[in-house]
Swiss-Prot record:
It comes from Shewanella sp. (strain W3-18-1). A zinc finger (FPG-type) spans 236-270. It comes from the Bacteria. This is Formamidopyrimidine-DNA glycosylase. Signal peptide: none annotated.
Length: 271
């Protein structure tokens, strides 16, 4: 599943081709995604795209009439292509631009979404209760400590809670906890401020580095230009259960936590 770095890399890839361009058509071949795709042709045709933003794992394509809210789901991708590019399997939506290009949404598993919001997007039900962005100053040790106060949940589950901080999915939660030396099952409310300070710094550093490297390539993710990400070569624990720890040589443990695979080093990461 694309996580925050992959979505940000996609945003950076498509924005230069979209901003200040006029929409001349919207082609919906299959509107049966995670939620039905609304028929917004009348609203969006003729509109100029003002900016392309990201909130958590959502891409926001702004026009004066409203905002398209796009989520890549488990396997979705957005590509900038010439108008006459042949349609392939799972190419569900084309946003057609006056500059001779299209923004094409492809999603084999159809867990993605393309929605429309005419209200301030912060009021949309999908966005209204989201926590702070991890790469902004709003995500800091004071905020995290307050959010974790009294919580008995495992710290990894809290890191992946979008009400606490957005966009830290399974890959980067595993990696950040390893880098911070914190066991993923550690009780969140009992982690001291010093360790939380390290954790916040590692979350920021790892996400920023993943964006710089072009995202993590697993089964489905490619950049907006079709190129793979390269951060998978840098993973220390995710997907490496049973292999040796890159720090101490101990065998990495693999468990299920919150229905997600969790990999950690029992020597380097403590409760």
């Amino acid at each position: 599943m694309p996580e925050l770095p992959e979505v940000e890399v996609t945003r950076q890839g498509i924005a230069p081709y979209l901003v200040e361009q006029t929409v001349i058509d919207l082609v919906i071949r299959n509107g049966s995604l995670r939620w039905p795709v609304p028929d917004i042709a009348k609203q969006i045709i003729g509109q100029v795209i003002r900016q392309v933003r990201r909130r958590a794992k959502y891409l926001l394509i702004d026009t004066d009439a409203g905002t398209s809210i796009v989520h890549l789901g488990m396997s979705g991708s957005l590509r900038i292509l010439p108008h006459d590019t042949p349609v392939e399997k799972h190419d569900h939506i084309d946003l057609v631009l006056a500059n001779g290009r299209i923004l094409r949404f492809n999603d084999p598993r159809r867990f993605g979404a393309w929605l429309w919001c005419e209200l301030p997007e912060e009021a949309h039900p999908l966005l209204a209760k989201l926590g702070p962005e991890p790469l902004t100053n709003a995500f800091n040790v004071k905020q995290l400590a307050a959010a974790l106060t009294g919580k008995k949940k495992a710290i990894k589950l809290c890191l992946m809670d979008n009400h606490i901080v957005v966009g830290v999915g399974n890959i980067y939660a595993n990696e950040a906890l390893f880098a911070a030396g914190i066991h993923p099952e550690a009780e969140a409310g009992k982690i001291d401020i010093e360790r939380l300070t390290v954790l916040v710094a590692e979350v920021k550093q790892i996400l920023a580095h993943a964006i710089k490297q072009g995202g993590t390539t697993l089964k489905d993710f490619t950049n907006a230009d079709g190129k793979p990400g390269y951060f998978a070569q840098k993973l220390h624990v995710y997907g490496r259960g049973g292999e040796t720890c890159t720090s101490c040589g101990n065998l990495l443990s693999e468990i299920r936590l919150g229905q997600r695979t969790t990999v950690f080093c029992g020597i380097c990461q403590t409760r």
